[in-house]
Regions:
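Low-complexity, intrinsically disordered export/secretion signals at extreme N-termini
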Residues: 1-69, 73
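Beta-strand-rich domains and repeat architectures in extracellular enzymes and scaffolds
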Residues: 82-116
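Repeated scaffold domains used in trafficking and secretory/extracellular systems
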Residues: 90-97, 143-152, 195-218, 262-270, ...
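Short coil/turn segments that connect the beta-strands within blades of beta-propeller domains
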Residues: 101-103, 157-158, 220-222, 273-275, ...
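Residue-level signature of beta-propeller blades and closely related beta-rich strand-turn architectures
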Residues: 111, 159, 166, 174, ...
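Beta-propeller blade signature
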Residues: 116-124, 173-189, 236-246, 287-296, ...
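Blade-loop segments of beta-propeller domains
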Residues: 123-158
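Loop/turn-rich, solvent-exposed surfaces of beta-rich toroidal or solenoidal domains
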Residues: 256-299, 309, 315
Length: 373
């Protein structure tokens, strides 16, 4: 299997503010030269990744991760989610997906060598059931044309979708399990280039829009794909919507709808009932209502509001609503960012869980039930 052999696990029973640091890991092997890389946000030198050769004597699946308790919220005790297992091996977490049928949380990580690792964990125990390196379309050389950043991940249970700045990669669950079992790179069933058309404008303001696959989510037969943009650069990110093929899981390229203007510095996105929910680099949780039909996908950005209630930390990434809570993945616990974090915050090494009633839902005139629906 594609093995993270150097990460011993332990169970944490004490109450903590954020996350318990995992044990130190052995130095990874030097991998081959990296493929071209496209960044979503601010960059800096990254640490070397973990050895993914699959050669080793330990179990291919990590020991159960800790699920510790956070300080009480206004609604009572709010335990944190699964531990982000691969932080100390040089991996930086990005996307968060949720498989409701299996009660599993998916996390994508990128490494210094521009590899992308998919980790699948049990929602309750945090134990890792699958880890696999993601590749491209070529069955003989799947490492060619592979994703290099893995900014977003989502699943409908049968197919797993990964956004990677310039493309959307589709994998079958069957292929991911096969590759994990055999210690090989998972082969994509589809790689669709995200359009980079010139002259894309915000329909409401005429502002230039940046089109990329920085983050994504899927819901009710559609894929929603958004792009990151810096604050104050005179541009904004675009969010597109694509219909999914029911049989193959592929994105239907000529079904594109939009764009909707994304918030500045958007990093993660999920779809709730009639709205998009974004995490941003300036610690917001932006609620954006939209209108959609078989032929259109539009939104009035004047209706968007921040419902974070001050509960989002720096370096927020992927996001989902799970069992009446907002689950947020952070990159602040990674080797790349932990020393850059404002000292008033602790690096987050577990997924954050926020009860929906603790958010500023009144600002959006919604209830927890409406968000969860």
């Amino acid at each position: 299997m594609l093995l993270i052999t150097s990460i011993p696990r332990r169970v944490v029973t004490t109450t903590q503010t954020d996350a318990t640091k995992p044990l130190a890991t052995e130095a990874p092997a030097t991998p081959p030269a990296p493929a071209p890389y496209f960044q979503d946000g601010l960059e800096a030198a990254r640490p070397s990744p973990v050895n993914l050769t699959g050669l080793g004597t330990k179990s291919a699946v990590a020991e159960p991760a800790s699920v510790a308790s956070a300080p009480p919220s206004s609604s009572g005790s709010a335990p944190v989610g699964p531990e982000l297992l691969h932080l100390d091996a040089g991996w930086t977490p990005q996307g968060q997906g949720y498989d409701a049928k299996r009660d599993e949380v998916l996390t994508t990580y990128y490494s210094d060598e521009h590899d992308v690792l998919l980790s699948v964990q049990d929602k309750g125990s945090g134990s890792e059931s699958l880890q696999v390196q993601l590749g491209g379309l070529d069955p003989k050389h799947p490492e060619e044309g592979k994703p290099t950043h893995g900014g977003g991940v989502s699943t409908d249970g049968e197919f797993v979708y990964v956004s990677d700045t310039r493309g959307i990669y589709v994998y079958t669950r069957e292929e991911l399990e096969r590759a994990a079992k055999t210690g090989t790179v998972a082969q994509a069933s589809q790689v669709m280039e995200v359009p980079f058309p010139e002259g894309v404008k915000d329909p409401a303001t005429g502002m230039d829009l940046v089109s990329a696959g920085s983050y994504m989510t899927v819901k009710d037969g559609y894929a929603y794909i958004g792009s990151y943009s810096k604050d104050g650069d005179g541009k904004a990110g675009a969010v597109w919507r694509y219909k999914l093929d029911e049989e193959t899981g592929s994105l239907i390229e000529d079904s594109r709808q939009g764009p909707i203007r994304a918030p500045d510095r958007a990093q993660g996105m999920t779809v709730v009932d009639g709205a998009l929910l974004f995490t941003t680099g300036d610690q917001k949780l932006v609620y954006q209502p939209f209108e959609a039909s078989a032929d259109s996908f539009t939104a009035n950005i004047d209706n968007r509001v921040d419902i974070s209630n001050g509960l989002i930390d720096p370096y927020a990434q992927g996001v989902n609503i799970i069992d009446g809570e907002l689950w947020v993945t952070y990159e602040s616990g990674s080797e790349k960012y932990r020393d850059k974090l404002n000292p008033k915050y602790e690096p987050r090494e577990h997924i954050q869980r926020i009860p929906l009633e603790d958010l500023d839902l009144a600002a959006a005139c919604v209830t927890p039930e409406q968000l969860e629906g």
